[in-house]
Design a protein with these regions (language model features):
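Conserved active-site tyrosine of GNAT-family acetyltransferases
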Residues: 35-40, 104, 139
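Vicinal oxygen chelate
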Residues: 3-24, 46-95, 102-135, 145-156
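Conserved beta-strand-loop-alpha-helix junction that forms the acyl-donor binding cleft
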Residues: 29-31
Length: 156
């Protein structure tokens, strides 16, 4: 198994080393400034690096990584209209769901599905997670999850 390491230089010249995940979504956004504020200030993602000239940013939160780039027509496969990302649900596993939920509430950001505990069957186990859903400024559906562990499925 090989590991890809990306080295980049931020705007003040400090070197960062990033282990790249096997899948890193790149979201097209309508307004880079608005989206960057939303992801970094409200959702508490870390800005790993940016290319302001391309209106691009690489972000992380715990072990999750995403890229955002203002729509420029380069990656479009069809016409974009709100809500972007129809039919997709990004599940983002985080360490402290209450901290993030509190940030959204403090910023009076609308919650699509309120925080709740759910258990999903996976063969003979139930996997638990505390979760809530929101739409980002462009309508991408984001499901934030904190794992609660697993337990045996009870026999009927």
């Amino acid at each position: 198994m090989s590991v890809i390491i990306l080295q980049s230089i931020n705007l003040v010249g400090e070197a960062f080393l990033h282990k790249l995940n096997a899948l890193i979504p790149e979201l097209s956004v309508s307004d880079m400034e608005k989206s960057l504020y939303f992801y970094s200030e409200i959702l508490l993602f870390k800005i790993e690096y940016q290319r302001p000239e391309d209106k691009f940013a690489f972000l992380s939160l715990n072990d999750c990584q995403i890229m955002i780039e203002e729509v420029n027509g380069h990656w479009n496969t069809g016409e974009l209209s709100y809500p972007y990302g129809r039919g997709i649900n990004f599940q983002i596993v985080i360490n402290d769901i209450d901290l993030l939920y509190g940030s959204l509430k403090k910023n009076e950001y609308p919650i699509k599905f309120d925080i709740q505990e759910n258990w999903y069957r996976a063969e003979t186990k139930l996997k638990g997670q505390k979760e809530f859903l929101i739409l980002d400024p462009d309508g991408y559906l984001l499901r934030f999850v904190q794992n609660l562990g697993e337990k045996d499925v009870e026999a009927d």
